[in-house]
Structures are given as structure tokens and as C-alpha cells.
């Protein structure tokens, strides 16, 4: 998550010279779309990569751009903190609607709390931002995964499992 520049493009070209089959994406190239010279180059970036693009953007803007032929991936589209994964199905309905959509990645897999024993009732206790007296911290922002620090699933993982299920059954011509 940084800016995009000619140096990034040179690095992408170098990667392609080493391995022409290697997929290259970089989300921050969108910050300079329309810049001269054009650095959002299909020769160096194989996919259009966005973070948190809305389903409306995907359907109404990305697909409407007739010059853009690359596939689209949400390199980050859902933040698993708290009740964050609540809109996965909406995204996947759009993703399944067009072969140019490649899916998306959830931020992030695991909470980063530090095990600190058990509570009096026997439940695991985890330390996080500020619990060690540090003056600068991100509070509970490190507890934003699909699983707890002990890898027990959050409800968000159960939703993702359902949305990512390998088989979907839909009714077709139900009146016949």
C-alpha cells in the first residue's frame, strides 16, 4: 500500500523478464490513472486490482470501460473485524455474473492477540493494544481476523465458508 511510479513499472518489467508467466498486480496504480506517461500499463500489470471497490463500481464503471480488457480482482474487499464480513454474498453474486471478475481477498486471516492464560470461567484471554501499558497502540485493531488467535473460527469465517461453497443450486424454469 504505497504509491505507484516508474520505478514500480521498471520492477514489474524486470519480474516479467525473469518469469513471463508471473501474474503482476498492484492496487495503487489506480491513483495515477490517466497520468502522462501512462503507467497503468497492461504490459506490466496483468489485472486491475482494487481495494474495497463497491459492487456498483464493479458493475457500472469497471465493466463500462470499453478500453479495459484485463480481469478485475478485489485485492482486499472485506475487513473481517467485528461484524465486517456481512456483505460477502452481495460481492460474489456480482463476481459470478461476469468472467472478468476474479474474486477477492479478505483482510485478514487471524487475530493477533497474545495468549495470556484463562479467565476465571476458563475462557482464553488475549492481550492486545494497550494491555502492556504501551502509550502508542492500535487498540483492538489487531483483532480483525476470520479466526481467533487460537484459530477458532469467528462467525465471519462461517459466512465465508458458505459463500465460497463449491456447489450452488439455483432454480431454473421453476414454473415448468
What is each of the regions a protein language model found here?
Residues 1-175:
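Extended substrate-binding grooves/exosites of carbohydrate-active enzymes
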Amino acid at each position: 500500500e504505497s504509491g505507484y511510479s516508474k520505478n514500480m513499472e521498471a520492477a514489474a518489467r524486470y519480474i516479467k523478464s525473469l518469469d513471463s508467466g508471473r501474474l503482476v498486480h498492484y492496487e495503487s496504480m489506480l491513483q495515477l490513472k490517466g497520468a502522462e506517461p501512462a503507467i497503468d500499463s497492461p504490459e506490466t500489470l496483468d489485472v486491475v486490482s482494487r481495494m474495497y471497490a463497491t459492487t456498483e463500481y464493479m458493475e457500472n464503471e469497471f465493466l463500462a470501460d470499453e478500453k479495459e480488457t484485463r480481469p478485475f480482482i478485489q485485492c482486499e474487499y472485506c475487513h473481517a473485524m467485528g461484524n465486517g464480513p456481512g456483505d460477502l454474498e452481495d460481492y460474489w453474486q456480482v463476481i459470478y455474473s461476469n468472467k472478468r471478475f476474479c474474486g477477492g481477498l479478505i483482510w485478514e486471516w487471524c487475530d493477533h492477540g497474545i495468549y495470556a492464560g484463562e479467565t476465571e470461567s476458563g475462557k482464553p484471554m488475549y492481550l492486545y493494544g494497550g494491555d502492556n501499558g504501551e502509550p502508542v497502540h492500535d487498540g483492538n485493531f489487531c483483532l480483525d481476523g476470520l479466526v481467533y488467535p487460537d484459530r477458532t473460527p469467528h462467525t465471519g469465517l462461517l459466512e465465508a465458508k458458505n459463500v465460497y461453497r463449491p456447489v450452488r443450486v439455483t432454480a431454473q424454469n421453476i414454473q415448468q
